[in-house]
UniProtKB/Swiss-Prot annotation:
It comes from the Bacteria. This is ATP synthase epsilon chain. Residues 90-103 have a biased composition (Basic and acidic residues). Keywords: ATP synthesis, Cell membrane, CF(1), Hydrogen ion transport, Ion transport, Membrane, Transport. Residues 90-115 are annotated as: Disordered. It is a peripheral membrane protein. It is found in: Cell membrane. F-type ATPases have 2 components, CF(1) - the catalytic core - and CF(0) - the membrane proton channel. CF(1) has five subunits: alpha(3), beta(3), gamma(1), delta(1), epsilon(1). CF(0) has three main subunits: a, b and c. Produces ATP from ADP in the presence of a proton gradient across the membrane. GO terms for cellular component: plasma membrane; proton-transporting ATP synthase complex. The keyword Magnesium does not apply.
Length: 135
């Protein structure tokens, strides 16, 4: 079976790079997308969610924020603001971030940036969901 490379990049640099990938599953704006070697070249937006990478020796789950993916026949490049492997997620920190975001959303203070609080809540809930995929 032909395999490909998957690289996930944030503003801080590459946070995930895996060779020998058999299939990658992405959550795009058009729905879930499976990518294998030889896929037609594509660029599309992805939602906050997770990337599931099946490679020769196992499966990785990576929590990602909104971003873009560039697919070539032999390589998939994912460009996002944040990315974190499931096993690296600090569950207590994610729970704390979720509680803070919910508190901000429930606070009727006009100084509260509602959109920012909603994004923070979405990221925290996503991190918790992805960490649960390992159980």
């Amino acid at each position: 079976m032909n395999t490909m490379n998957v690289n996930i990049v944030t503003p801080n640099g590459s946070v995930y790079n895996q060779d020998n990938v058999e299939i990658t599953v992405l959550q795009t704006v058009g729905g879930d997308m499976g990518v294998m070697y030889g896929h037609i070249p594509t660029v599309t937006a992805i939602h906050t969610g997770y990337v599931k990478v099946h490679y020769t020796d196992g499966i990785d789950y990576i929590a990602v924020s909104d971003g873009f993916v560039e697919i070539r026949q032999e390589k998939t490049s994912i460009i996002v603001q944040t990315a974190e492997k499931a096993e690296d997620i600090d569950v207590r920190r994610a729970e704390s971030a979720k509680e803070r975001a919910e508190s901000h959303l429930n606070n009727n203070d006009e100084d509260t940036d509602i959109n920012r609080a909603k994004r923070a809540l979405e990221r925290a809930e996503n991190r918790l969901k992805v960490s649960d995929l390992l159980k």
